[in-house]
Amino acid sequence: MADVEEWLTHARKVTQEASIGVDVTSIQECISAEPAQRVLVARRDAWRAICCAAFAALVAFAAINRVATIMLEKPAPTWVATPSAASPFGLLIGK
């Protein structure tokens, strides 16, 4: 236990020597200028909610687009016919 007491005495001495020329008010001003932990957590939660909403909107848009494409896409036969006489391509096809 004597080693612990020695260590604590030495630590107190080193701490007191290191803090002699420290300007405590400037440190407190720097700490008070930083946002509180609650503010940081709220910002992170808001950013996460915005990202989740954007991703959900993107997925919903893709799903609705897919459903609309399937519903509106009606297969129609493609007929191959000769071009009309008024078409310039009609001159290329001989009779």
UniProtKB/Swiss-Prot annotation:
**InterPro entries, from UniProt?**
CnrY (IPR035230)
UniProt topological domain (Periplasmic) ranges: 69-95
Phylogenetic placement of the source organism:
Bacteria, Pseudomonadati, Pseudomonadota, Betaproteobacteria, Burkholderiales
* GO MF term list: molecular function inhibitor activity
Write down what this protein is called.
Nickel and cobalt resistance protein CnrY
Induction of its expression: By nickel and cobalt.
Keywords carried by this UniProt record: Cell inner membrane, Cell membrane, Cobalt, Membrane, Nickel, Plasmid, Transmembrane, Transmembrane helix
Show the GO cellular component annotation of the record.
plasma membrane
